[in-house]
Amino acid sequence: MLIIETLPLLRQQIRRLRMEGKRVALVPTMGNLHDGHMKLVDEAKARADVVVVSIFVNPMQFDRPEDLARYPRTLQEDCEKLNKRKVDLVFAPSVKEIYPNGTETHTYVDVPGLSTMLEGASRPGHFRGVSTIVSKLFNLVQPDIACFGEKDFQQLALIRKMVADMGFDIEIVGVPIMRAKDGLALSSRNGYLTAEQRKIAPGLYKVLSSIADKLQAGERDLDEIIAIAGQELNEKGFRSDDIQIRDADTLLEVSENSKRAVILVAAWLGDARLIDNKLVELA
């Protein structure tokens, strides 16, 4: 497994792979890897000849400096996990390598609408940072496919739109959420939970499932469903942050023409902001 930290060396390897006619898959990550990331790697390996995993804690997508400062940097452990998975290439650049002149004056990619709604409304600049770094990685790695987790549902929708709008010839693969046995969605942020909070955390998925059951039973008073769910989260020990029920295909308000809904939930548990989602077919 090659570990590359500079743009010239990455370009050199990508040119070689292209000359050899290899099909390349990219798995963009911020490190602190868990089994959910490994599922992305496995999906990439099944679809391509060569798998490139990027590990880069992107300062441009953090709306709070304290979150950036405390995000775990576990490069050695991450590389050991990826080596066991027989990943071909790890791209682990420094911030200076990606943003040599800083982030303030760096060219950015913005996806209007999707960047500022839902999660984007409460995290200004976050999705602009995501679309900028992902587009830069696409230009550098030139992958045939790229794998992203469905846990970050809005992010996946944003990347699909960016790829379509910008004409990237890349297949975007959404990989289903991986959960612990008790239902908690795997996330790097779960590491912020204390032992006691970890026992409470599966309650998020239980509330999510309760909303889904109501929708599948034909309930359509969305305001009431959301209000009850928020109350349930608070009673379980969370601080409900945002609960949305949206059209899964547009992320707009659910209408009588909507065929699928996505339930998007965000809640604080201690210092961890947990997010989860669930798709529901509407009768």
From Swiss-Prot:
Q: Which UniProt keywords apply?
A: ATP-binding, Cytoplasm, Ligase, Nucleotide-binding, Pantothenate biosynthesis
- BP GO annotations: pantothenate biosynthetic process
Leftover remarks: The reaction proceeds by a bi uni uni bi ping pong mechanism.
**Organism of derivation:** Escherichia coli O1:K1 / APEC
**Protein name from the UniProt record:** Pantothenate synthetase
Q: What does this protein do?
A: Catalyzes the condensation of pantoate with beta-alanine in an ATP-dependent reaction via a pantoyl-adenylate intermediate.
Self-association state and partner proteins as the record states: Homodimer.
Among the Pfam families in the record, one is Pantoate_ligase
- Gene name per UniProt: panC
Which residue spans traverse the membrane?
none
Q: Which GO terms describe its molecular function?
A: ATP binding; pantoate-beta-alanine ligase activity
Q: Which family does it belong to?
A: Belongs to the pantothenate synthetase family.
Write out the residues that bind (R)-pantoate.
Q61, Q155
Q: Which principal EC class is assigned to this enzyme?
A: ligase
Carries keyword ATP-binding?
A: yes
Pathway(s): Cofactor biosynthesis; (R)-pantothenate biosynthesis; (R)-pantothenate from (R)-pantoate and beta-alanine: step 1/1
**Binding annotation for beta-alanine:** Q61
Q: What does the record give as the reaction this protein catalyses?
A: (R)-pantoate + beta-alanine + ATP = (R)-pantothenate + AMP + diphosphate + H(+)
CDD domains given in the database record: PanC
Catalytic residues, per the record, are: H37
- Name where it's found: Cytoplasm
Q: Which GO terms describe its cellular component?
A: cytosol
For the ligand (ATP), the binding residues are 30-37, 149-152, 186-189
Which InterPro entries does the UniProt record give? Cyt_trans-like, Pantoate_ligase, Pantoate_ligase_C, Rossmann-like_a/b/a_fold
Whether rRNA processing counts among this entry's keywords is: no
Q: What is its EC number?
A: 6.3.2.1
